[in-house]
Amino acid sequence: MSYTTANPADVDSVMDEEYGGMWFLRDALDAERVGVTIMELEPGANGKEHNHAHDGQEEVYVVVEGTVDVDLDDESVTLSRDDAIRMAPEQPRQIHNRGDETARLVLVGGPGT
């Protein structure tokens, strides 16, 4: 078969339910070169501060519901529905839902060029 499908219901969330949910779909999709994650952030919740300097992975975040702030060093970028941001591997980042509604994002990561 030349395609696979997956749904967040197919995998366990790696985030405490009170903060939302985070579902890694890479294995469920049998993806080899790209990671795909669905993330839900409840109001007031944050993602983990991190970068990918250790593995050279660049990331793209796409907001599909709600609004989030992505903190990048001394700057905060606000993203709303249908907005996307790409970050280089070495860029420290942290997602925050400072709004009053649940935010939902698709996170995609793969080897940098």
Regions found by a protein language model. Give the residues of each.
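Conserved short histidine dyad/triad with adjacent acidic residue
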Residues: 21-25, 37-55, 89
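Glycine- and acidic-residue-biased ligand/ion/polar-headgroup-sensing regions
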Residues: 56-73
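Short acidic-glycine-tyrosine-enriched beta hairpin
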Residues: 73-90
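Residue-level recognition of specific faces of alpha-helices
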Residues: 35-37, 59-62, 104
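Short, charged/polar surface micro-motifs in flexible loops or helix N-caps
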Residues: 31-32, 42-47, 67, 111-113
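A short, N-terminal "cap"/entry segment at the start of jelly-roll beta-barrel domains
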Residues: 1-35, 42-43
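Ligand-binding loop in jelly-roll beta-barrel domains
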Residues: 89-113
